[in-house]
Amino acid sequence: MAQELMFEEPRRGKPPRHLADFDAEGRASAVAALGLPPFRAKQLAHQYYGRLIADPRQMTDLPAAVRDQIAETMFPNLLTAAREVTCDAGQTRKTLWRATDGVTVESVLMRYPQRNTVCISSQAGCGMACPFCATGQGGLTRNLSTAEIVEQVRAAAAALRDEFGDRLSNVVFMGLGEPLANYARVLAAVRRITEPPPTGFGISARSVTVSTVGLAPAIRKLADERLGVTLALSLHAPDDELRDTLVPVNNRWKISEALEAAHYYAEVTGRRVSVEYALIREVNDQPWRADLLGKRLHGALGPLVHVNLIPLNPTPGSDWDASPKPVEREFVKRVRAQGVSCTVRDTRGREISAACGQLAAEGG
């Protein structure tokens, strides 16, 4: 049975507040409420964002007498690793996280020769109901808090440092959920990720990607924030007739509206927009659709667009599969012939259901 679109999360209790939920002013207020001197706020932020420590009992520059109090009030254990699985010779690791209310989400850490990327979740489940995506088939449980999002990043950065002596370079909001449907918390998380220590992790905004199925008003709103992050538009079809089915939000905002919003984003930020296109055998891989995709993107975005073709990854309950390689190559050639940059994405994590469209946070 097809899922219905859900833009509002079901009513649920909120996760406990955490240091990562607060901006600088909020941290100062939280520290003052504990009766601590103002400089402790910056100290705590430095420990968390700079040293990647999430347990005040390990913060040796804090008086021992206040560590337990700070742990209880500002550092609740929001996410517990319930399961980890790896593939690609240990270069890809998927973690199933369990939140304080029992909901589960997933993140995927991918190590490459020149970069280290973590794919993070912004919601538990997803309300966008895309039929080829495991997350969309499961529906929306709730939004994640800012701190629950940020904690996925801190955990990945700490793992890279402690296990490999390496640094986290890239963050992509491509895990569970539609990031722009959880706008305020995702925006706050992006700020924590990109601001320099001691107020954030200091990851370049150009190395942070926020994906969306095409919530046009929110794309424009994000452009006006002028954060400079990369926008990834999950398009998957160049014509409204097919996209209405593949990406049901298209019934609310048509392709032309999504592309106009993407053009606005590129114009305001100067950043090239990434267009994601899952190639599905005999569904959206026809030559004429490749031609139309190239024409529409070139007309809307000119040189400020790049197409990432994604070979469809298998998901439970779906009979669709990836297009054959010759069809894939022809599709790339035709899109490029329209003057649009196009490549096939390197797929990681398929064996452990960690690839694009496979995350569902099941089990544990």
From Swiss-Prot:
Top EC group: transferase
EC number, as in UniProt: 2.1.1.192
GO cellular component, one term: cytoplasm
Reactions that this protein is recorded to catalyse: adenosine(2503) in 23S rRNA + 2 reduced [2Fe-2S]-[ferredoxin] + 2 S-adenosyl-L-methionine = 2-methyladenosine(2503) in 23S rRNA + 5'-deoxyadenosine + L-methionine + 2 oxidized [2Fe-2S]-[ferredoxin] + S-adenosyl-L-homocysteine; adenosine(37) in tRNA + 2 reduced [2Fe-2S]-[ferredoxin] + 2 S-adenosyl-L-methionine = 2-methyladenosine(37) in tRNA + 5'-deoxyadenosine + L-methionine + 2 oxidized [2Fe-2S]-[ferredoxin] + S-adenosyl-L-homocysteine
Top-level lineage group: Bacteria
Binding sites annotated in the UniProt record for [4Fe-4S] cluster: 126, 130, 133
Residues annotated as catalytic: 106, 356
Transmembrane segments: none
Keywords attached to this entry: 4Fe-4S, Cytoplasm, Disulfide bond, Iron, Iron-sulfur, Metal-binding, Methyltransferase, rRNA processing, S-adenosyl-L-methionine, Transferase, tRNA processing
Chief location category: cytoplasm
Domain Radical SAM core: 112-350
Role: Specifically methylates position 2 of adenine 2503 in 23S rRNA and position 2 of adenine 37 in tRNAs.
Leftover remarks: Reaction proceeds by a ping-pong mechanism involving intermediate methylation of a conserved cysteine residue.
Protein name: Probable dual-specificity RNA methyltransferase RlmN
